[in-house]
């Protein structure tokens, strides 16, 4: 066996950032992500279009487990549900200064 590796150290990503920096960036966003109606086409194999009517994703298990990615209502994976991101109020530091009078007419 080879030497033991320290698994607690931050591992760099391909872009040079570390896992700790990436996690800190996710926490700063404070965005709420919800998964709404299921969009899985159950009739795709026969050339049709039919959805099951599931209105909102409900996790089957605890956060961090494989079951958390399956919907308790329809049994589909979370990726089949429409993703909705509720962003905080946009903080725009930009201003439109049209009073200079140097624009074209």
From Swiss-Prot:
Q: Which domain of life is it from?
A: Eukaryota
Identify the stretch(es) annotated as Disordered: 1-29
Q: Does the keyword RNA-binding apply?
A: no
* Keyword terms of this UniProt record: Cytoplasm, Metal-binding, Zinc, Zinc-finger
Q: Does the keyword Ligase apply?
A: no
Q: Name one GO molecular function term.
A: DNA-binding transcription factor activity
Q: Where are the zinc fingers (ZF-HD dimerization-type)?
A: 35-84
Query: Which coarse location class applies to the principal site listed for this UniProt protein?
Result: cytoplasm
Q: Name one Pfam family in it.
A: ZF-HD_dimer
Record's GO cellular component terms: cytoplasm; nucleus
The listed locations are: Cytoplasm
BP-aspect Gene Ontology terms: regulation of developmental process
Relate the assembly described in the record. Answer: Homo- and heterodimers.
Summarizing the function annotation, the protein's role is: Inhibits zinc finger homeodomain (ZHD) transcription factors, by interacting with them to prevent both their nuclear localization and their DNA-binding properties.
Name of the molecule in the record? Mini zinc finger protein 1
Q: What is this organism's lineage? A: Eukaryota, Viridiplantae, Streptophyta, Embryophyta, Tracheophyta
């Amino acid at each position: 066996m080879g030497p033991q590796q320290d698994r607690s150290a931050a591992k760099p990503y391909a872009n040079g950032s570390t896992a700790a920096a990436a996690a800190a960036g996710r926490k700063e966003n404070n965005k709420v992500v919800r998964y709404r109606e299921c969009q899985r086409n159950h009739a795709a194999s026969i050339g049709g279009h039919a959805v099951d009517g599931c209105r909102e994703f409900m996790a089957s298990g605890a956060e961090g487990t494989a079951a958390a990615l399956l919907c308790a209502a329809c049994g589909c994976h979370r990726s089949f549900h429409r993703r909705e991101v509720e962003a905080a109020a946009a903080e725009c530091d930009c201003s439109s200064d049209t009073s200079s009078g140097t624009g074209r007419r």
